[in-house]
Swiss-Prot record:
One of its GO terms (cellular component) is cytosolic small ribosomal subunit. It comes from Moorella thermoacetica (strain ATCC 39073 / JCM 9320). The gene is rpsI. It comes from the Bacteria. The lineage of its organism: Bacteria, Bacillati, Bacillota, Clostridia, Moorellales. This is Small ribosomal subunit protein uS9. SUPFAM superfamilies: Ribosomal protein S5 domain 2-like.
């Protein structure tokens, strides 16, 4: 018999996460490594776990995530959005809870491009009056 799986895609900055929820005991695997081994920072682990804890689904599903691009913060945010969308697929009644906590909103902030004549996106070279 085929196992029930739920999918969700999350993006944040330049990171893209493809998340699969499989019935299990609450393991979170990111790119074939356990969550704490992959990120190493407690704050990022908490960020990833938030949707599961708010909806009381922490022990019901194993999370299998493939994430690429971006840095650690962007990847954690992308996984969080992917988990939230997959949970919504699993149980539509969770929408108000997830929406209230802001887990279904894609963060639109991106790195601003560098402009010519400037050192960074907005940092100008030192101005000399004379």
């Amino acid at each position: 018999m085929a196992q029930v799986q739920f999918y969700g895609t999350g993006r944040r900055k330049n990171a893209i996460a493809r998340v699969r929820l499989v019935p299990g005991e609450g393991r979170i695997i990111v790119n074939n490594r356990p969550l704490n081994e992959y990120f190493g920072q407690k704050i990022l682990e908490m960020l990833v776990r938030q949707p599961l804890e708010v909806t009381d689904m922490a022990g019901r599903f194993d999370v299998l995530a493939r994430v690429e691009g971006g840095g650690t913060t962007g990847q954690a945010g992308a996984i969080r959005l992917g988990i939230a969308r997959a949970l919504l697929q699993a149980d539509g009644d969770l929408r108000p809870v997830l929406k209230r906590n802001g887990f279904l909103t894609r963060d639109p902030r991106m790195k601003e491009r560098r402009k010519y004549g400037l050192k960074k996106a907005r940092k100008a070279p030192q101005f000399s009056k004379r």
